[in-house]
Amino acid sequence: MSTTVTPLTTADAETLIAAARRATDEAGVPVSITVLDAGGHLLAFRRDERAVLISGETSTAKAYTALQLNAPTAEVADLVKPGGPFHSLPTGLNEPLLFIAGGVPVHRDGQLIGALGLGGGAPEQDHGFAQAALQAL
């Protein structure tokens, strides 16, 4: 028996962006926010004009990494450190992977439907903002 899960919609992506913005605005941290669909395609993006320029790239790479590994980037960062089981993974693939906290997968009914990434704050801040945004779905 096959069940169909509603994919991540533009409305969902806008909800995630708005929730992340509320969290970052309350903390006074300017960030970039990326939402990807299950295929890794950009669904929504928002960069605070005060955020560091590279945050747009880091938020997208964090979201992509969380999507590909179906895990928060905060949980996999230690795996690629020297001596970790996947130490060579970031350089062994031609993919925009970034093993820094701030990327989280998005699930619906237990199925992976996309990912959210934040960049611009400290890694633990970005992770907290992403987790807070997920609560809005």
Give a label for each model feature.
Residues 1-137:
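Flexible, solvent-exposed loop/hinge segments and secondary-structure transition points
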